[in-house]
Design a protein with these regions (language model features):
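Alpha-helical transmembrane segments of multi-pass small-molecule/ion transporters
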Residues: 1-325
């Protein structure tokens, strides 16, 4: 096991090193803060959709439509959201901050970090389960938490309106469309014309380093702006959510997946391992931007994301070692 964990550390070091490079570049202003939205836009609208299209097109359609994966992941996401909202709400933390704390606990950084990292560790067979988790979290988990965040201000009517706006935002996001087009290409065994395929391949190859560098830059920007706006969030409001994300969430996914298999759900071992490793990823960096947009305590959210990203450098290889053992 120690040798295996060391080997996994050696695989993951370049991924986290790119995140650290982006953080240092933004923190030192070598990368101007004003340039980060443009870098993020390149990853979100060009490089990452091309990478996801290629994974979708090269993954058997049966893996992309695996209901067992969706059921296990969805149940764990809902349980995590419910638990974090329940224990977070108090006289200082209302629905808005509790909902975004729940989102940052249940939503791993699957798109920017998980796809390249897990395919490097598990191979291309991990792409199907990972893509399913991306779709579920982007469409349902995010929309649910945004709806819950509005309960403070406008009750159930405001929550329903917020959910509709969140779903409209999903439709404007190119990532689900790239996955859908890739799935259709897989189902139809369609191959793109040579020049188009090479162009998409070049953009897709740029996705991994650009996305990881962008994570670090976004974390640095969010931390700096949030600290200027509200000061530093107290540890008691940050650490429990970090522990949920990196410890409770993977354990919950492992337990639910094991129970699902025990009750006869056709969940393969590779898919189960992929789900546990997705849950062990740090929090999604884009939650910070959502929290800022909806007026939540972005200082707290940014700190949770930063802590999970730093801690995952040590915790993630351990989870991989246990899951692969």
């Amino acid at each position: 096991m120690p040798v295996l964990v060391l080997q996994i550390f050696l695989v993951t070091i370049p991924f986290f090193a790119l995140v650290a490079a982006g953080y240092v570049a933004a923190r030192s202003r070598v990368l101007p803060l004003e340039a980060i939205p443009g870098l993020n836009a390149f990853v979100l609208f060009f490089a990452l959709p091309c990478m996801l299209y290629r994974f979708g097109a090269n993954t058997p359609i049966a893996q992309l439509l695996d209901g067992s994966v969706a059921l296990v992941w969805g149940l764990c996401a809902l349980l995590t959201v419910g638990a974090v909202v329940a224990f977070s709400r108090n006289e200082r933390i209302g629905w808005n901050d509790a909902a975004f704390g729940a989102l940052v606990a249940a939503f791993p950084n699957t798109g920017f970090m998980g796809v390249p990292l897990l395919t490097a560790i598990l191979g291309v067979q991990a792409a199907g389960p990972v893509i399913i988790t991306i779709i579920f979290d982007m469409v349902l988990t995010s929309s649910l938490c945004i709806a819950l965040s509005r309960l403070d201000a406008a009750g159930s009517h405001g929550a329903a309106q917020a959910m509709r706006k969140a779903l409209a935002g999903v439709l404007r996001n190119p990532m689900p469309w790239a996955i859908l087009l890739g799935a259709l290409a897989s189902a139809a065994s369609y191959k793109l014309p040579g020049p188009v395929d090479r162009t998409i391949a070049m953009l897709g190859d740029a996705a991994s380093p650009a996305a990881l560098f962008t994570i670090g830059a976004v974390l640095a920007r969010s931390a700096m702006l949030a600290h200027q706006a509200r000061g530093r969030a107290p540890v008691r409001d940050v650490l429990p959510v970090v522990l949920v994300k990196l410890v409770a969430h993977p354990l919950l996914v492992c337990a639910v997946a094991w129970l699902a298999r025990a009750f006869g759900l056709p969940l393969g071992t590779p898919a189960m391992v992929a789900l546990v490793l997705v849950a062990a990823l740090p929090s999604a960096s884009n939650v910070s931007m959502l929290a800022e947009r909806f007026g939540a305590d972005n200082g707290r959210i940014a700190r949770i994301i930063l802590w999970t990203t730093v801690a995952a450098f040590f915790s993630f290889p351990l989870v991989v070692g246990q899951a692969s053992g």
